C-alpha cells in the first residue's frame, strides 16, 4: 500500500496491442493486463476450500502433478534454492549419531518439470579443531571424548532436548595452518566432532576455560574453524554451492509418503531422505548451469488507514492483496489476481476474489500462498511492511492457520527484529520473517545493496530504471476509495495490481534474481545469505573450499577493531585544467587480483615476522625464494608454494573467461542472461578477495596482504607514468612529449599532445602493450577509452566525453561531480549537467556562463520550481555528534504526524527556508509540501552559496581562472530578488492584513477598503481587469495541462487525480499552480460583476 511507500511505485509495461487514441479508459497497464495470455479465463471469482492442507482450488494455481518415483529405479535431479538445518531424530540406516537429537540439513528445490522438492540430508556432524599439545597421543582421544562429553552435557542449561551425547568423536589429524608459511610439514591437530552445531562453541569454550584432563592442559591450544556456520560447513564438505543441481542416484535415497516412516513434514510435492555422502552435487557449468522453472510470487497489500495516521495492524484493516506469479524464464505472470474486501468491479486479465469479511480474505490468501507454493517471495518493502502487517493483523483477528506460510507444516512464520549495519548499506532497522523453504527476496533491499539512488520510493526507482511514472495514492485517500462503490474499489485494485507487477518488471530489467543466483553458485553460499549477510561470507566460503582440498585449516579470529592502518592506493597529482586535445586512458585489468596472482600473495605464503631465520635453517629457504613487497612484508614465491588466494583468483577469472566465450556463441535470450550474470558474479567475487584480507573486523584479516597489494599498485602507477613519459618524447620521434596528467588507483590519463582521436587511440594501444611487457604476468595494462575534451577538476573529480571508437562518443562521463552526488538538490545536478553538456558536447563556454547567470537570477527571483530544490539525506542514526538538518526535520515531522514521519534508514527530503540572520541550517530545514502549503520563503542565498557556488567554481575555474567567482556569482544578474510572505511563523500571527490596490499595489485609502482599485487606478479598471483575467486563464491552462498529464499517468482521463508522488516534479508543480489559481481567482472576484 502507499503508506509503506516512502517505498512505492508503478507498473507500466509495453502493451501488446496498439493503443487507440480515442480509448480513454484502457491505457498502459490496464491494456497490458488485458493482453496477457488466458486473460479471458481470469475475469472471474473463484471459490476456495477450507483448511491449510489439500484445499480444492483453481488448477491454474497448483504445480504440475509429480511423476511416480521409485527410489530403486529412478534418479532424482533438482535445483536447490534454500539450505537450512533443524534438529531431528536419527533415521535408521543413516550415518551419524544414533541417539537423538541430531542435526538434519534440509534442501528445498525444484525439478526441471516444475515439481517442488524437500530433501532431508542425514549424518553430517559439526566439528572443529584445536592445536594438539605436545604430550597428546592417539590413545588420549577416547579419554578426551568422554571427559569433554560429560563437561558439555553438564554445561547445558535446561536440557529440554534430552541430549544424551554431545561429543561424538575425537581424532588426532595432521593439517597445515593457513596463516603463515611454515614449510610443508603438517602439524598435529585434534579434530572434535559434536552432535549439535551449538556444541561447537560450548566445547571450544570449555577447553579454553576448564580442566578437561588432569594430565594435559588444553587452555593455551588455539581453536580452528569453530566459528563456521553449520550450513556453510555442510556445503563446503559436500561440494554443494548455492542454487546448484543435486542428483540422488537410484538405490541411495528414500521417498516419504502417507505410509512411510517418518511421515512427510513439508508441503512439497516430493519429499525424500538421503545420507550426506550418497548424493551428487553438480558444478554449475555446461549442462548443469540450467535454471529450473521456479515460481516467484510478487504481492502488495492495501490498508484502510485513518486520516493523518499511518496504518496500524491492530486497528486498520487489510482491504486488498494483489498477487502476480511468474515462472523464472517466462515473460508473463501466469497467475494474476486480487483479493478484495467487499464487492469490486471486474478487471480484464485478472481474477477478482471478493470477500465479505477481512478474516475470510486473509484466510483465503494464506491458503492461496500454500497452494501456489512459491519458491521466491518478492515485492517492495515486504520485509518491513507487508509481511509484518499481515502477520500482526491476522494474529489480532485470530485468523486460524494464517501464519503457516512456509513449506514445513508445523512451523509458524514469525517476525524477528534485526539491526543491519555494513559499510556498503549503512545502518538500517530491519524485520525478518522466516518462510522455511521459500526465499524472501525484497526488491527494496536488493536496490539498497546494489544501487546508489537519490530516492528509493518505488515510483522513483520505476522512473530511474523503466522511465515510467505512476499514480501514487496517499494512505489517507485509500480509505475513501474503499468506502466508495465497486468502481472506486476497482481503481484501488488496479493500483494494487500495478504495485505487485512492478517488482517483477524491475527484477527482469535488473536481472536481479539471475545475478544473485549466479553469485550464490560462484561463491558457494545459499541464496538467502547473499541478502541477509555481508561480503565476507562469500570469500570465506571459497577459501574454506580451496583450503579443504590442500589440507589447510583456518584459525579462529576474534574480531577486534585495530588502529593499525595500511597506506591506500596512489593518486598522481592532477594537472588541473580544460583539455581540448584527446586524453588517452590506460587501465589495469583486474588490478588487485592480478597483483595477488603475480606476486603470490596469500595467507599460506606469508613469512611471518621472526620466522625467516628459522625457515632458512629448518626448511632450507633461500633468499631468492622469498619476495619482499614494497610494504616491507615477505612472501614465498610460487615455486616454493602456490598460494590459495592466487589459485582461487585464477579459477574465478578462468571461469569468467569461459562464461564470456560461451556468451559470444549463445543465442537463447534467457541463457545469455544467466551467462552474463555468471561473468558479472565472477568479476565481483575476484575483486572482493582483496577486501576480505583488509577487513580489520573480519573472519581472517591480514594487513600484510592488503598493504602489500596497495603498495604494489602504487609502484605500478608510478612506473607506468615514468615509462610513458620517458618513451613518448620528441627525441624518440613522436609528435610531442607525452605527459601523464592524472593517475588514480588503477588507471592513468595521458596527454600525448596529438589532435586527432584516431592517433590518440593508436598511441594508447601502443603504450598499453609497451608498459604491460614490463610487468609480471598476469598484470596487464589495457587501452580502453579516450576523453575528448576533458575537464580535470581535482583528485577523483573529472568529466569528459568518453570515446571507445573515433566516429562518435559513447557517453558523457563524470566522476565526483555533483551530477552524480545524492546529497545535493536536483538543481545542482541539472545545472552541472547542462553546463558540462555546453562545455564538452557543444564546446560553448560563453553559452555555459550565460546559462549559469540565468539560473542564478531565476533562483533569486523565486522562479525555480520547489522540486528542484529538494535535498535528500538518509536517516542513518539519530545521535549525530553535530545537529543535522534531516535529523531535526524528522523529529519535527514526528511531532506533526508520527505515522508518516521518516524512520531510521529512510531518505528524508527537505528544503532550506529563509530565517533570521545566523540561524543554523539545521533549524531552517522544512518539509517541501509544508513549505508549499504555507508559502514559506526559500533561502535562495543558502542554495547559491552552499549548494551552487563550489561546484560551479570547480568546473569554471580551469576555464575562467581567478575571475570565475566575480563573473558567475556577482554582477547584474544577482541584484534583483523576490521575497515571499510566509503564512506561518515569525510575525505572521500578530499582523493585520490590509487590502492593497490591484493596480499600483499601494494600500487602499480610507473609504476604499472594499474596492479593488485606488482612485488613481480606477480609470484603468477595464485594462487591469483584462490583465487579471488573462493571468487567471494562463494558470487554468497550466493546471489543465498538469492535470491531464497526471490523468494519463493514472490511465484514466475521467477520474479525479489523487496521486501524491513526491518524487514526481509535476506533483509540486500541480500543488503550486492550484494555490496560485486560488489566489488569482480571489483577485478577479475583487472586481465584482463586470457591470461597468
Swiss-Prot record:
Catalytic activity: DNA(n) + a 2'-deoxyribonucleoside 5'-triphosphate = DNA(n+1) + diphosphate
Co-factor remark: Binds 1 [4Fe-4S] cluster.
EC id: 2.7.7.7, 3.1.11.-
Tissue: Expressed in ovaries (at the protein level). Expressed in embryos (at the protein level).
UniProt keyword terms in alphabetical order: 4Fe-4S, DNA replication, DNA-binding, DNA-directed DNA polymerase, Exonuclease, Hydrolase, Iron, Iron-sulfur, Metal-binding, Nuclease, Nucleotidyltransferase, Nucleus, Transferase, Zinc, Zinc-finger
Cofactor: [4Fe-4S] cluster; Mg(2+)
GO CC annotation: delta DNA polymerase complex; nucleoplasm; nucleus
pH dependence of activity: Optimum pH is 7.2.
This protein's domain notes: The CysB motif binds 1 4Fe-4S cluster and is required for the formation of polymerase complexes.
Subunit structure of this chain's protein: Catalytic component of the DNA polymerase delta complex consisting of three subunits: the catalytic subunit PolD1 and two accessory subunits PolD2/Pol31 and PolD3/Pol32. Within the delta complex, interacts with both PolD2 and PolD3, and is able to interact with PolD2 in the absence of PolD3. Interacts with PCNA and PCNA2.
Record's miscellaneous remark: In eukaryotes there are five DNA polymerases: alpha, beta, gamma, delta, and epsilon which are responsible for different reactions of DNA synthesis.
Protein name, per record: DNA polymerase delta catalytic subunit
Amino acid at each position: 500500500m502507499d503508506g509503506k511507500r516512502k517505498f512505492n511505485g508503478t507498473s507500466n509495461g509495453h502493451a501488446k496491442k496498439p493503443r487507440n487514441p480515442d480509448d480513454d479508459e484502457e491505457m498502459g497497464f490496464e491494456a497490458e493486463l488485458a493482453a496477457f495470455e488466458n486473460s479471458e479465463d481470469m475475469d472471474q471469482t473463484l471459490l476456495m476450500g477450507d483448511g491449510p492442507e489439500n484445499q480444492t482450488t483453481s488448477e491454474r494455481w497448483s504445480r504440475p502433478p509429480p511423476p511416480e518415483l521409485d527410489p530403486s529405479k529412478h534418479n532424482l535431479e533438482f535445483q536447490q534454492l534454500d539450505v537450512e538445518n533443524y534438529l531431528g531424530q536419527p533415521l535408521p540406516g543413516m550415518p551419524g549419531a544414533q541417539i537423538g537429537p541430531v542435526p538434519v540439513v534440509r534442501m528445498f528445490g525444484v525439478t526441471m518439470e516444475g515439481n517442488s522438492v524437500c530433501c532431508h540430508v542425514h549424518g553430517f556432524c559439526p566439528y572443529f579443531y584445536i592445536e594438539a599439545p605436545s604430550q597428546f597421543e592417539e590413545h588420549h582421544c577416547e579419554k578426551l571424548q568422554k571427559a569433554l562429553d560429560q563437561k558439555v552435557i553438564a554445561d547445558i542449561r535446561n536440557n529440554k532436548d534430552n541430549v544424551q551425547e554431545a561429543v561424538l568423536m575425537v581424532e588426532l589429524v595432521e593439517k597445515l595452518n593457513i596463516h603463515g608459511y611454515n614449510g610443508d610439514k603438517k602439524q598435529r591437530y585434534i579434530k572434535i566432532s559434536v552432535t549439535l552445531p551449538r556444541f561447537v562453541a560450548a566445547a571450544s569454550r570449555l577447553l579454553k576455560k576448564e580442566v578437561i584432563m588432569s594430565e594435559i592442559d588444553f587452555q593455551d591450544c588455539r581453536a580452528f574453524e569453530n566459528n563456521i556456520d553449520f550450513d556453510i560447513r555442510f556445503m563446503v564438505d559436500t561440494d554443494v554451492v548455492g542454487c546448484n543441481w543435486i542428483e540422488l542416484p537410484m538405490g541411495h535415497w528414500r521417498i516419504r509418503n502417507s505410509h512411510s516412516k517418518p511421515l512427510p513434514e513439508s508441503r512439497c510435492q516430493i519429499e525424500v531422505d538421503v545420507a550426506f555422502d550418497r548424493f551428487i552435487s553438480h558444478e554449475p557449468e555446461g549442462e548443469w548451469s540450467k535454471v529450473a522453472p521456479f515460481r516467484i510470487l510478487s504481492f502488495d497489500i492495501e490498508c484502510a488507514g485513518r486520516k493523518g495516521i499511518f496504518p496500524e495492524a491492530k486497528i486498520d484493516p487489510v482491504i486488498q492483496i494483489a498477487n502476480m506469479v511468474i515462472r523464472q524464464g517466462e515473460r508473463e505472470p501466469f497467475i494474476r489476481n486480487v483479493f478484495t474486501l467487499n464487492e469490486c468491479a471486474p478487471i480484464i486479465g485478472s481474477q477478482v476474489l471478493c470477500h465479505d469479511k477481512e478474516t475470510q480474505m486473509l484466510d483465503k490468501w494464506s491458503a492461496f500462498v500454500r497452494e501456489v507454493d512459491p519458491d521466491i517471495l518478492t515485492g517492495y518493502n515486504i520485509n518491513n511492511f507487508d509481511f509484518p502487517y499481515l502477520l500482526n493483523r491476522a494474529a489480532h483477528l485470530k485468523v486460524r492457520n494464517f501464519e503457516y506460510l512456509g513449506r514445513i507444516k508445523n512451523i509458524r512464520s514469525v517476525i524477528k527484529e534485526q539491526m543491519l549495519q555494513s559499510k556498503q548499506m549503512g545502518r538500517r532497522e530491519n524485520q525478518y520473517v522466516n518462510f522455511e523453504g521459500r526465499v524472501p527476496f525484497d526488491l527494496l533491499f536488493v536496490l539498497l545493496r546494489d544501487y546508489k539512488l537519490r530516492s528509493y520510493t518505488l515510483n522513483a526507482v520505476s522512473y530511474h530504471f523503466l522511465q515510467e511514472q505512476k499514480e501514487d495514492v496517499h494512505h489517507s485517500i485509500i480509505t475513501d476509495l474503499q468506502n466508495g462503490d465497486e468502481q472506486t474499489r476497482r481503481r484501488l485494485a488496479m493500483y494494487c495490481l500495478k504495485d505487485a507487477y512492478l517488482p517483477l518488471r524491475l527484477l527482469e530489467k535488473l536481472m536481479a534474481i539471475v545475478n544473485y543466483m549466479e553469485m550464490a553458485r560462484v561463491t558457494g553460499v545459499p541464496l538467502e545469505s547473499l541478502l541477509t549477510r555481508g561480503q565476507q561470507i562469500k570469500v570465506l566460503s571459497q577459501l574454506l573450499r580451496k583450503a579443504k582440498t590442500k589440507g589447510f585449516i583456518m584459525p579462529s579470529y576474534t574480531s577486534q577493531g585495530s588502529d593499525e592502518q595500511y597506506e591506500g592506493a596512489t593518486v598522481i597529482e592532477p594537472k588541473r585544467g580544460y583539455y581540448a586535445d584527446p586524453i588517452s586512458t590506460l587501465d589495469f585489468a583486474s588490478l588487485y587480483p592480478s597483483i595477488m596472482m603475480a606476486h603470490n600473495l596469500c595467507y599460506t605464503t606469508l613469512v611471518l615476522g621472526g620466522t625467516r631465520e628459522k625457515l632458512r635453517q629448518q626448511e632450507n629457504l633461500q633468499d631468492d625464494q622469498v619476495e619482499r613487497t614494497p610494504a616491507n612484508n615477505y612472501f614465498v614465491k610460487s615455486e616454493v608454494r602456490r598460494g590459495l588466494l592466487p589459485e582461487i583468483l585464477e579459477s574465478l577469472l578462468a571461469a569468467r573467461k569461459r562464461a564470456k566465450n560461451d556468451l559470444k556463441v549463445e543465442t537463447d535470450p534467457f541463457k545469455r542472461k544467466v551467462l552474463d550474470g555468471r561473468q558479472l558474479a565472477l568479476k565481483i567475487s575476484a575483486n572482493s578477495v582483496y577486501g576480505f584480507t583488509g577487513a580489520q573486523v573480519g573472519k581472517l584479516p591480514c594487513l600484510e596482504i592488503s598493504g602489500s597489494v596497495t603498495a604494489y599498485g602504487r609502484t605500478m602507477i608510478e612506473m607506468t607514468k615514468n615509462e610513458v613519459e620517458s618513451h613518448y618524447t620528441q627525441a624518440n620521434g613522436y609528435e610531442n612529449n607525452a605527459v601523464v596528467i592524472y593517475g588514480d588507483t588503477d588507471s592513468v590519463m595521458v596527454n600525448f599532445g596529438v589532435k586527432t582521436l584516431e592517433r590518440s587511440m593508436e598511441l594508447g594501444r601502443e603504450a598499453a602493450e609497451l608498459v604491460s611487457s614490463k610487468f609480471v604476468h598476469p598484470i596487464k595494462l589495457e587501452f580502453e577509452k579516450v576523453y575528448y575534451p576533458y575537464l580535470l577538476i581535482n583528485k577523483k573529480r573529472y568529466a569528459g566525453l568518453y570515446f571507445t571508437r573515433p566516429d562518435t562518443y559513447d557517453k558523457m562521463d563524470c566522476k565526483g561531480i555533483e551530477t552524480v552526488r545524492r546529497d545535493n538538490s536536483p538543481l545542482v545536478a541539472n545545472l552541472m549537467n547542462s553546463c558540462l553538456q555546453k562545455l564538452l558536447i557543444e564546446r560553448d563556454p560563453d553559452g555555459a556562463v550565460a546559462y549559469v547567470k540565468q539560473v542564478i537570477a531565476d533562483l533569486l527571483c523565486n522562479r525555480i520550481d520547489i522540486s528542484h530544490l529538494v535535498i535528500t539525506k538518509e536517516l542513518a542514526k539519530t545521535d549525530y555528534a553535530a545537529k543535522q538538518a534531516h535529523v531535526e526535520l524528522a523529529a519535527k515531522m514526528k511531532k506533526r504526524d508520527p505515522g508518516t514521519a521518516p524512520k531510521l534508514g529512510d531518505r528524508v527530503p527537505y528544503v532550506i527556508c529563509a530565517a533570521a540572520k545566523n540561524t543554523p541550517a539545521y533549524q531552517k530545514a522544512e518539509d517541501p509540501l509544508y513549505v508549499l502549503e504555507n508559502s514559506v520563503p526559500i533561502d535562495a542565498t543558502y542554495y547559491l552559496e552552499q549548494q551552487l557556488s563550489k561546484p560551479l567554481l570547480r568546473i569554471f575555474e580551469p576555464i575562467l581562472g581567478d575571475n570565475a567567482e566575480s563573473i558567475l556569482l556577482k554582477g547584474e544578474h544577482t541584484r534583483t530578488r523576490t521575497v515571499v510572505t510566509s503564512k506561518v511563523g515569525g510575525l505572521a500571527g500578530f499582523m493585520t492584513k490590509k487590502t492593497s490596490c490591484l493596480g499600483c499595489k499601494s494600500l487602499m485609502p480610507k473609504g476604499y477598503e472594499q474596492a479593488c482599485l485606488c482612485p488613481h487606478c480606477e480609470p484603468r479598471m477595464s485594462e487591469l481587469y483584462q490583465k487579471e483575467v488573462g493571468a487567471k486563464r494562463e494558470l487554468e491552462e497550466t493546471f489543465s495541462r498538469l492535470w491531464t498529464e497526471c490523468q494519463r499517468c493514472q490511465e484514466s482521463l475521467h477520474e479525479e487525480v489523487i496521486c501524491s508522488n513526491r518524487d514526481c516534479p509535476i506533483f509540486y508543480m500541480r500543488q503550486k499552480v492550484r494555490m496560485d489559481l486560488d489566489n488569482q481567482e480571489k483577485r478577479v472576484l475583487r472586481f465584482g460583476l463586470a457591470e461597468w
